[in-house]
C-alpha cells in the first residue's frame, strides 16, 4: 500500500510537469517575438544608415530568425527567403514552431516590403512592424503568464485524479 501511495504521488507530479511542458511553447513564442522586436532597430541601422545590402544586413543580425532569412536569401527576395525559412522552421522543434498565425502574418508582411522601397518607406515599415510585434509580444507575455499557471494546475489536477484512481 505505501508503494502505491508513493507511485500515486509521482504520477501526480509527472502530470503537473507535463502541464508545465505544454506551457513552454507559450514562453518560446514570447521569446521569439521579443528577440525579433529587439533585432529590428539594429537591422534598420545596418540597412538605412550603414547602407549594407539587405542580405548582408540580415546575416549580421544577432537574432537567429533574421540571420536564417539572410542565409536563405541568395537569389531570392526577402519574402521568398522568409517563406522558405518559415516552412522549415514551423515544423515541430523548429525556431518558429510556437508562433501563432498572426505572428507569422506580421512577419510575412514585414519581409514582403523589406528592401522594396526607399528609405522613408522603410522607416515607416520598421515603425509599423515594431508596433505590431510589440503588441503581439505583450499578448504573448500575458497569455504565457495566465496559461502557464492554468496548464500546470490542470496537469496537477489530472495527476491527482489518476493517483486517486490508482490507489
Residue ranges of each PLM-predicted region?
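Residue-level recognition of alpha-helical structural elements
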Residues: 29-32, 54, 78, 103, ...
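Helix-adjacent hinge/juxtasegments
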Residues: 58-99
